[in-house]
Regions:
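Proteolytic processing hotspots in large secreted/extracellular or virion-associated proteins
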Residues: 1-117
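Generic cytosolic/nucleocytoplasmic N-terminal low-complexity/intrinsically disordered segments
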Residues: 10, 32, 48-49, 118, ...
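Proteolytic cleavage junctions
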Residues: 68, 75-174
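Feature responds to low-complexity, polar/acidic, surface-exposed segments characteristic
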Residues: 140-165, 173-197, 201-220
């Protein structure tokens, strides 16, 4: 609690907690303030326990032998621990250290969330940061998170030596952009305004059905 008090008092905008060089959690000032208020009279404990036995076949298929961790946050007071499962609208940034296996494309690496019954959610806005050697994502709750991989589909034959190959695979695997055919992406072809706006909309999670009319004739 004293550490949180000091961080908030000094208006520390970002605070990073590293656990065994395997998991890092970055906490912003607003979240620090919330945790500071919640820790009155006690302490806040952050844990990242490695998960060796995944709960379901779905989770095993998604994560395979890649790392998975049970992230938890508890309030400790008087020897009693109370789980904090949600951040009430705030988020934290998480890094899961990982070195891609031979043949894995970094654009197809994801963070995956595994719920209490073993159902998997692929976190679309996660990504692999080569400079950090980690999969990075944001979340507002604590549970089991791991590193997942989706095989490239479709298999574009014209991007192997392209400078943006990993970025193309990232965008295609998350459904932001599609190829010009089942096997080609045409990476040097210009992007229309419609393609650009569509990709931005998909990235933002917009439902096109909510918009009955559009101002651009080339946006579909």
């Amino acid at each position: 609690a004293q550490t949180l008090d000091l961080l908030v008092k000094e208006n520390v905008r970002q605070f990073t907690v590293a656990i065994d060089h395997l998991v890092s959690v970055n906490i912003g000032l607003d979240t620090l303030k919330q945790l500071d208020a919640a820790s009155a009279g006690g302490d806040i404990i952050l844990r990242a326990n490695k998960v060796d036995a995944l709960r379901s076949t779905e989770a095993k298929v998604a994560i395979e032998t890649r790392p998975a961790y049970d992230l938890s946050l508890v309030y400790l007071s008087g020897g009693k621990e109370t789980p904090i499962t949600s951040l009430n609208g705030h988020t934290i940034s998480v890094r899961l250290s990982y070195t891609p296996a031979k043949g894995e494309q970094t654009g197809n690496l994801y963070a995956v969330y595994v719920d209490d019954v073993g159902k998997v959610e692929w976190i679309t806005k996660s990504s692999y940061d080569a400079s950090l050697k980690a999969v990075v994502f944001e979340t507002g709750h604590f549970s089991v998170y791991g590193v997942g991989y989706k095989n490239p589909a479709p298999a574009f034959t014209d991007i192997h030596n392209h400078w943006a190959a990993d970025n193309i695979l990232f965008a295609a695997s998350r459904g932001l952009l599609s190829g010009t055919s089942d096997t080609t992406f045409s990476p040097n072809t210009g992007m229309t305004r419609g393609m650009f706006v569509t990709a931005l909309g998909r990235l933002a999670g917009i439902n096109p059905d909510s918009y009955k009319t559009g101002k651009f004739t080339d946006v579909k």
